């Protein structure tokens, strides 16, 4: 459960990301593909090379979904319902991949915002990404 402090930390951090959200989403995807090669199996139709337009576009989708989640932290299940359905029923993404992407998002944010990435912010973002992952995998059961 996200505390009031966690929500405040996440909103403040996400606010600083601003127009870079799509760029960071793409970078996190690239990190995920490099660090966890099995994740590539869900994107056989993508050009997965560095700077690929397809990876950038999907990175923007990830960022947009997270921006929506930040805006609706008090009701993630409703806000993420359609995305949960998509990943569970159509794409059938292995739930562990959300953890991999979450880790790579944390690394990406820490690289770009080291001064703001305090232990408290790190913990809050980790809890937030975990909450989003839990919602995205809730329909698997």
From Swiss-Prot:
The modification Phosphothreonine is found at residues 108, 134, 137. The modification Phosphotyrosine is found at residue 24. GO terms for biological process: cellular oxidant detoxification; hydrogen peroxide catabolic process. GO terms for molecular function: heme binding; iron ion binding; oxygen binding; oxygen carrier activity. It comes from the Eukaryota. Residues 1-141 form the Globin domain. InterPro entries: Globin (IPR000971), Globin-like_sf (IPR009050), Globin/Proto (IPR012292), Hemoglobin_a-typ (IPR002338), Hemoglobin_oxygen_transport (IPR050056), Hemoglobin_pi (IPR002339). It holds the Pfam family Globin. Disulfide bonds: none annotated. The modification N6-acetyllysine is found at residue 16. The modification N6-succinyllysine is found at residues 7, 11, 16, 40. Involved in oxygen transport from the lung to the various peripheral tissues. Heterotetramer of two alpha chains and two beta chains. PANTHER family: HEMOGLOBIN FAMILY MEMBER, HEMOGLOBIN SUBUNIT ALPHA. Belongs to the globin family. This is Hemoglobin subunit alpha. It comes from Felis catus. The gene is HBA.
